[in-house]
Structures are given as C-alpha cells and as structure tokens.
C-alpha cells in the first residue's frame, strides 16, 4: 500500500508488510523472476533486477531464494511464466487506486481484484482511468528527527528532484532513473532511510474518514493479501488519529 506519506501511514504499511512476510517473499520472488526474464540475470546490466534484489535483501530473504528466482527467470531452472500489468479504479470516498499484478492466470486475477473493489464499495475502471493522477518517482523516507539539512544538501547534490520535511520526517523525491544514485550517495554519507523504493506518487490527495476510511483500508488489505497483487497505490489522505483508530 502506498498512499499518504505521513509517518503514521508509513509505519502502518511497514508493520502490515512485516506481518505478511511470507506473502512479501512470494511477491519479491515473482518480481525477481520477471525482471531476470526480461533483462537477464546480470545485476550490473539489469537495473530492474538490481532494485528487486535490493528489496529482497532488505526483507531478509535468504540468498539461496534470490539466486533460485534469478535462475528461474533466466531459464536455468524450470519456473512459472507470469504476465504483468495494472488495474485501475476507485475505492471508497472516490480514492484513486492502481493495482500492479503478476499472474499465471489473468482471468482469476481480474475476478479476484474486481471482487475486492466491489465488496467495499469501490469500482474497477478502464485502463488510464486514474493513472494520470500519479507520477512514477523514487521515494526515500527518513524517520522522525532525521537531519533534514544534511539530507537536503546531499540529496539535491546527488540529483534529487525535491526534499520535503513534515513533522520531522524527511521525504526525498527522485526521477526513477536517478533513484539508485541518490539513495547510494545518501548511504555513503551515513544517511540510512526507513524506506526507499520506486513508487507511484499521487499528484493530489483525497481525504477520507470514518466508515469510508475503514472500508478503504479493508479493501487495500484484501488486495495486498492476494498473491497475484504486487503493489497497491492510492491517493488517500487519512489523518494520523484516524489511521491509529482504524488500525486499533
């Protein structure tokens, strides 16, 4: 799930992902396999594979699992063939939602995703219905009480597009092509982020609260529980207090 960038939501997302570590491994293995199939198994020459392997390492995936996934992608080991793509639609409260998927059975995935939208009052749309509301960017988040001035200086010098501060949380935005350079430069300066990824960032946020916020989070959780779903992006804005109440 990727929505509002406030620290409360980042922490919710991280906690939810940690609780679903088995599913996270499944999704990461798919991403590594597809990246290796498309661009080959050489990490130096395949940026998508490099990013996928980095995420797997951050999730503490065993090295053997990573190497096996690469070999399945390159054909050195037998593996499943996956189709990838996106679904777009609206969730409760008119929140725009993008779902990235990888599947070996598109018919099943379409039915499952549509069911998740419908169950909680959302609606699946056509391709292009909400994608224009998002930009693909590198996003590097530093936790509360981070050294904004140092991050700002290092990040912009390394090629970042923007650096924001909100309640002590620092967010660095980059073009996708510059993400690795900026992240690595920050790391070399001893600046370790809470999260770092190429993601879809909303251009505008949609505020939701009460029952709509609850239904939205349930819908997103149901989508993320689907093994065929890789990522869910949404332009929701839920207050810290409301998010804490929903997550109980």
From Swiss-Prot:
InterPro entries: Integrase-like_N (IPR017856), TACO1_YebC-like_2nd/3rd_dom (IPR048300), TACO1_YebC_N (IPR049083), Transcrip_reg_TACO1-like (IPR002876), Transcrip_reg_TACO1-like_dom3 (IPR026564), YebC-like (IPR029072)
Domain of life: Bacteria
Gene Ontology BP term (one): regulation of DNA-templated transcription
GO molecular function: DNA binding
Location in the cell: Cytoplasm
Pfam name, any one: TACO1_YebC_N
GO cellular component terms attached to this protein's record: cytosol
Key words of the record: Cytoplasm, DNA-binding, Transcription, Transcription regulation
Stored SUPFAM superfamilies: YebC-like
Protein family membership: Belongs to the TACO1 family.
UniProt-listed PANTHER family: TRANSCRIPTIONAL REGULATORY PROTEIN YEBC-RELATED, TRANSLATIONAL ACTIVATOR OF CYTOCHROME C OXIDASE 1
Descriptive protein name: Probable transcriptional regulatory protein Pcar_2335
Organism: Syntrophotalea carbinolica (strain DSM 2380 / NBRC 103641 / GraBd1) (Pelobacter carbinolicus)
């Amino acid at each position: 799930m990727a929505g509002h960038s406030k620290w409360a939501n980042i922490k919710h997302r991280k906690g939810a992902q940690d609780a679903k570590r088995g599913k996270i491994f499944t999704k990461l293995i798919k991403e590594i396999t597809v990246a290796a199939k498309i661009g080959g198994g050489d990490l130096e020459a395949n940026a998508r594979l490099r990013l996928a392997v980095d995420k797997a390492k951050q999730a503490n995936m065993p090295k053997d699992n990573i190497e096996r996934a690469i070999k399945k992608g390159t054909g050195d080991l037998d593996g499943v063939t996956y189709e990838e793509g996106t679904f777009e639609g609206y969730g409760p409260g008119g929140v725009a939602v993008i779902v990235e998927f990888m599947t070996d059975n598109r018919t099943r995935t379409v039915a499952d995703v549509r069911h998740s939208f419908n169950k909680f009052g959302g609606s699946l749309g056509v391709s292009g219905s909400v994608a224009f509301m998002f930009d693909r960017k590198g996003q590097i988040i530093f936790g509360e009480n981070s050294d904004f001035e140092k991050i700002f200086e290092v990040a912009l010098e390394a090629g970042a597009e923007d650096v924001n501060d909100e309640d002590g949380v620092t967010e660095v935005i980059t073009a996708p092509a510059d993400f690795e350079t900026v992240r690595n430069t920050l790391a070399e300066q001893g600046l370790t982020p809470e999260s770092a990824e190429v993601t879809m960032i909303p251009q505008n946020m949609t505020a939701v609260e009460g029952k709509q916020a609850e239904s939205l989070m349930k819908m997103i959780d149901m989508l993320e529980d689907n093994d065929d779903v890789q990522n869910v992006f949404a332009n929701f804005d839920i207050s810290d207090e409301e998010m804490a109440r929903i997550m109980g």
